[in-house]
Amino acid sequence: MSLSNKTVKELRQLLKERYTVEDELTESIALSSMRFKPSQEPEFHALSQSSLLKTKLKQQSSTDIPSYTHVLISKLSCEKITHYAVRGGNIEIMGILMGFTLKDNIVVMDCFNLPVVGTETRVNAQLESYEYMVQYIDEMYNHNDGGDGRDYKGAKLNVVGWFHSHPGYDCWLSNIDIQTQDLNQRFQDPYVAIVVDPLKSLEDKILRMGAFRTIESKSDDNSATSYYELETIIFDSELNRALFETKLNLHCVIEDDESEQISLNRLIDSMKQYSYLMDSKNVRTRIKLATTSERVSNENKKNIDYQNRSTRSQFCLNTQRGDSTETSSFGSMFSGDNTSDVDMEDRNLTEFDSTDTSLCINGEPSIHVNRVERSSRSTDNFHNSKKRMNSNQERCHDEGNDMLQRNVLETDYARAKNRILASKIKQYERLRFYKDTFTL
């Protein structure tokens, strides 16, 4: 298959038709194809980062404590939170939200993660985490010393909340989360808690995120703390929008050398196993041929022995029949015939007057031997037939197992081969695209 004459479009079509491999979602796919929930409020349709900053600068201080109902979060913060959560996997992560307040809205402009110790169901911030947070905010967001702080057009960013992940069990606040959020709201309000579910976000390709605040519900005897969810609205910068409209629509595939090496190892293993399977089959075939030849030789010997025994038995039987005839002829000489000159009445019993006959004595053993040989021959035939039937069943069973193993190995070989070819064609397609794009 020659690829030098194919265009980039044809290469992509070839990859789509022949070498598409259904893999699990990865971090790069999640961040590049994640869809964000659009705003349903008409007043927020024209929302942008610059408009929020201008409104913040014009806002006058008020002593009234607002009831926050909306969280405005930048797309940059959403991507950062998603990146941290996906990288954490099944382990919970935690971070800090930076922004400001605007009327009854909490605006999140940026965020950063904290070095915490997390498990699959809990995350704890230790003393080192708080020290890191203070130093990071002082270095990155402090404008008093005229350092290289992040400039948001004069709007100072403060800590407005925290975020953490719930891998696989949706967005809500647990009892510990409610206590943590209530404590922060009491001492540094405004404060909001954002929860993200990275696993369901990867599965649905939609950002699963929720913003929550606690509220104290008073009753007659005791007071209980509950929480409510704020509406989350995502905004973007005009610079990002312009870049998005003018950028090349190119999906950059992250090259994974380990994945290609794994496919190559699987290909080699499949070839080795297939060769071993064929060698084992040939060895079994040679053993069966040798066993069959030996069995046929033994059967031929048994047939020859049986024929020899049958011939000897027939010869003995014929000989005994001849002796019996002579004995009868000899006895007729002493019979009571009227024409005989010998007087039979006065003679004494001699050896010829025995009541036993040699014909019966000599004839019965030969008939018995013949019957035993026939019975033995029938038994041998039955056992030979049974052995042949068992050998046929074993051969069919071995052939079925060999065919099944061969099909599995051929499938693994084809899959590994296609993955390697797809990886090489993707590399060539990117190089060809760069050449066609940047060559004058």
From Swiss-Prot:
Effect annotated for changing H166A: Abolishes deneddylation of CDC53
Keywords: Cytoplasm, Hydrolase, Metal-binding, Metalloprotease, Nucleus, Protease, Signalosome, Zinc
Residue interval(s) of motif JAMM motif: 164-177
Protein name: COP9 signalosome complex subunit 5
Gene: RRI1
InterPro entries linked: JAMM/MPN+_dom (IPR000555), JAMM_MPN+_peptidase_M67A (IPR050242), MPN (IPR037518)
Binding site residues for Zn(2+): H164, H166, D177
Cofactor: a divalent metal cation
High-level lineage: Eukaryota, Fungi, Dikarya, Ascomycota, Saccharomycotina
Organism this protein belongs to: Saccharomyces cerevisiae (strain ATCC 204508 / S288c)
Limits of the MPN domain: 71-218
Outcome when changing H164A: Abolishes deneddylation of CDC53
